[in-house]
Amino acid sequence: MATYYSNDFRAGLKIMLDGEPYAVEASEFVKPGKGQAFARVKLRRLLTGTRVEKTFKSTDSAEGADVVDMNLTYLYNDGEFWHFMNNETFEQLSADAKAIGDNAKWLLDQAECIVTLWNGQPIAVTPPNFVELEIIETDPGLKGDTAGTGGKPATLSTGAVVKVPLFVQIGEVIKVDTRSGEYVSRVK
């Protein structure tokens, strides 16, 4: 893999630090009037998703990480692993609960997901930005009940719980933003 110096760090670059892959989220190159130039870099640890801020001297370097994002189709969950398929090669990959994280509640059969691979192993799964799910349980909305503006909780077909407006009923299909977990709209 390529070697990157700290002044080459840009948002989106994936590098290796301490034997683990990191993604550069922001980089600021600082050249003080006195002393050596340095880069203040915000990184995201790809294995856990935690954010770290580090300072690199201008002479510091890091190895590029062998990290690949692939568009794969979600097939099914067998209880232990979530299975995905590459639509071009029909090759199947299995991701464990650690790679899926909280995103399991947004996965629908045949949904296009972005699977992040490191050394050929899935380390993160990103569902589509928006999913359409059916409401299977929610309190009935009472006519004229507009005192509270907060809405009500609704359980969706995948088990996710989302706050929805009072007018939404059981059996309706709604659009949800998977990044924030918020209700977007009803689907006609």
Curated annotation (Swiss-Prot):
PROSITE patterns attached to this UniProt entry: EFP
Chief site of localization: cytoplasm
Transmembrane annotation, as ranges: none
Gene Ontology CC: cytosol
Record's keyword terms, sorted: Cytoplasm, Elongation factor, Hydroxylation, Protein biosynthesis
Cited Gene3D superfamilies: 2.30.30.30, Nucleic acid-binding proteins
Any Gene Ontology biological process: peptide biosynthetic process
GO MF annotation: an example: translation elongation factor activity
SMART domains on file: EFP (SM01185), Elong-fact-P_C (SM00841)
Protein name: Elongation factor P
UniProt organism field: Klebsiella pneumoniae subsp. pneumoniae (strain ATCC 700721 / MGH 78578)
Name of the gene: efp
